[in-house]
Amino acid sequence: MALNVSKVVPNSPILVKSVNASRSRRVLLAYVHHPLAANKGSSIEELKQGLCCTKTVTFVSSRRCSTLCFVGKSQDTETNSQVVQKEGEKQVMPRRKSSNSSQLLVEYVSNDAKFVNERARNDFVLLSRGIMRLDARARQDVAILGSGFLKLDARAREDTEKIDRDVKRKAERLHHIATIFKNIAESKLKNAADKHWSDGALEADLRRADFRAKQRAMEDALMALEFIKNIHDMMVNKMVDSLVTSETGTTDRISLEKNGIALGFFPGEVSSDRISAIEEAYKSMASALSEADGIDYTDPEELELLVTTLIDLDAMDGKSSASLLAECSSSPDVNTRKALANALAAAPSMWTLGNAGMGALQRLAEDSNPAIAAAASRAINALKKQWEVEEGDSLRFMMNFERPNDDDDVDSDLDEI
């Protein structure tokens, strides 16, 4: 009979069996020297009887490794180191030295360390395989996500193209519907016009439009007559004032000097030649009023004469003058706007132009015609430079009293303001 020794690893599906005679002998020796066997005084015969039982004896070590002893027949009886005699004979068991027990312990510890090392190596292999599986799974998930994003992008592109096609199709449909409505409206309007013409209402509309045009022409003629009347009244007042001054023998005049040089900012006297020219212009305008429905402002010479007269009479801020300047500055005729720009550019100062004249110049400076805009801009810059005062300049307002009868001796009293 012999002992078969096997190791049982906890939580391990594999039971490793070893049939080794020397190992069986060591286990048996350890059992013989067990303290319990020594205290009870067990004999070799009792040990034999104990070994012949079919129960399992378990020894648990401190390293969680169990050793199971099974009783059974030995496959190789020649390798047994124990000899069991027959019944009635004494059983002889040799004593082992202490060196054998220490060697047994060393071998046991070495085998246990090898087992632990092998187990750790297997655990590392399993861990490495698990990490590799996780890495492969992560790569697979990333690939799945990438393919999902690509599918979403392709789906978005398809949806965008579909929406674009739908919008274009709807726009074409709306354009087609609008064209149909336009054709229907044109046909209905044509039918209504034909019906209106057949009923005689269109002729009434034409008469009404002609009446409104004549009414507008009469209003323009009335405005022109009032304008001419105002200018005529101003000329008469100017001539009366000149006659009064000639009777008294003195004329007072305000002048402005800059650095000792007189500036012609203020209007002076109107000469007899200018008055006669204005009277001829009035007569021509009056004859034109009898033939036409208003003053012909498209004549550049006539317009320049009117504006120059208003400047000389210091009447640029009047109601009729302001309406004339506004109408001529926004006229569609290029020659009219150009003549107005030239006439306003001939003004001696901003003082004589007034708000109406400067407003007309600013509108002409923004004209679409480059020549008109350049002329108006130059006039504005020239007028602004007259009032620029640099360091060291001096401006003086002078009141000059003159006697027109004295040609040789001119006595003037200058009062500085």
Curated annotation (Swiss-Prot):
- What's an example GO cellular component term for this entry? chloroplast
Its BP terms in the Gene Ontology are:
cellular response to oxidative stress; leaf senescence; reactive oxygen species metabolic process; vegetative to reproductive phase transition of meristem
Instruction: Enumerate the subcellular locations listed in this protein's record, separating them with semicolons.
Output: Plastid, Chloroplast
The record's tissue-specificity note reads:
Expressed in leaves. Expressed in 7-day-old seedlings, roots, rosette leaves, cauline leaves and flower buds.
Q: Per the record, what phenotype accompanies loss of this gene's function?
A: Delayed age-dependent and darkness-induced senescence. Increased resistance to oxidative stress.
Keywords, A to Z, come to: Chloroplast, Plastid, Transit peptide
Q: Please report what switches on or represses expression of this protein.
A: Induced by abscisic acid (ABA), salicylate (SA), methyl jasmonate (MeJA) and ethylene.
The record's listing under InterPro entries reads: AAF-like
Q: Where is the transit peptide?
A: 1-36
- Protein name per the record: Senescence-associated protein AAF, chloroplastic
Identify the species of origin.
Arabidopsis thaliana
Give me the gene this protein comes from.
AAF
